[in-house]
Amino acid sequence: MSRDTIRLPHDAYRLLQTLRASGHSAYVVGGCVRDSLLGRLPGDWDICTSARPDEMKALFCSQRLILTGEKHGTVAVILHGKPYEMTTYRLDGSYRDHRHPDNVQFVDDLAADLARRDFTINAMAYAPGEGVIDLYGGRSDLAARVVRCVGTPADRFAEDALRILRALRFSAKLGFALDPATAAAALAARDTLRTVSAERLYTELDGLLLAPGAGQTLAQYGEILSGAVPEILPCIGCTQPGKWHCYDVWQHSAAAVGALDLRGQDTRGVRVLCWATFLHDIAKPLCRSVGPDGAAHFKGHNQRGAQLARVILRRLKAPAYLVDGAVGLIAVHDAPLPADDVGILKLLNRSGAIFLRRLCALKYADLDAHANTPEVAARRADVAAFERRMNELAKTGCYTMRQLAVNGADLMDIGIPAGPGVGATLQTLLNDVMEGTLPNEREALLAAAVK
């Protein structure tokens, strides 16, 4: 036990005091203790207590309660719009589905409750006046930057297969390594991830990929991750001899995720880019050939990768915007970019500035995970030049019908009949403007429309 002081939110402190004043023991527990000790701001404050669900309901009957977890001992109370989960100390029964206990047994012992938790860094509790309760070495593992299972790792993963991905997510989120015994048990149990619902797999993978240390975690634990995404296994050890690459396909993909610069991207853009980069070369093992010079070639891996990424993302039940956004980027991630204004304007017309900014971010990350050669540096300079000019033209150029100095009503006013011909004429005018053969000026456009 440590006498360190953790500053609790007023509402969490109030809940603890109410439970304790009624004769129950109660502590904040889990991630909020871990994050507080790391100097991070906890997102949630969970409470464990000797109080049974009926006792909690009676104590907080004047508050709004959520009772969906009551059979497992959890009562959530809503204070100032924020839920606080309070859970009775418990022992878990067997886990026949590798996800949920078949039954739970309520107990009065905090130590028994902490023993059932996943990792030592999540198995600490705290109460004012008592300090941090750390029975399984969580603090030393925080100091050593290690994710370690409580007790026997194989048992923890047999109880709940999703803990395998949780271990990787914590590795990526915190920049921690897996304890060797924990990593070995996770690898041995990776196939049990097939028993976990697609939605839960997606949520954990998404959290991993969006974490700051995702690249390093992917590089270290690809074989474990293949239990959730089997398609990555052929990428591990798939070599890329030649002047462009210094990594195999998997290590390259991991390095690209780590190299992503997400500044300026909105929430959806961040997610789309993380997943697109993760899967951008997923089909390379299927397309690999070796030329007479010994260099590896991957003809068609863009399109085939887009198809395979769509299968993976749909299987994981990813949101539609993510599926379409990531697949669209993968399909063209290795395609050359135009250097001339006409080509850039036409690309803006087809794809839009948001897509092209995402594409540049993916291309930068992809190239930064290549070999450090003059050829790669030249390609990166080409992307930078394209991005600069594209951003300029996105602000000042004309590449959509709405940006034309005339509209359909203007064309009908000069005698063009209503119908498909109006749209066709506008498209012709837009093409001429993008080609640079016609200025985007009202009189010039109207004159061209009647020719």
At which residue positions do the language-model features occur?
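Catalytic cores of the polymerase beta-like nucleotidyltransferase superfamily
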Residues: M1-K451
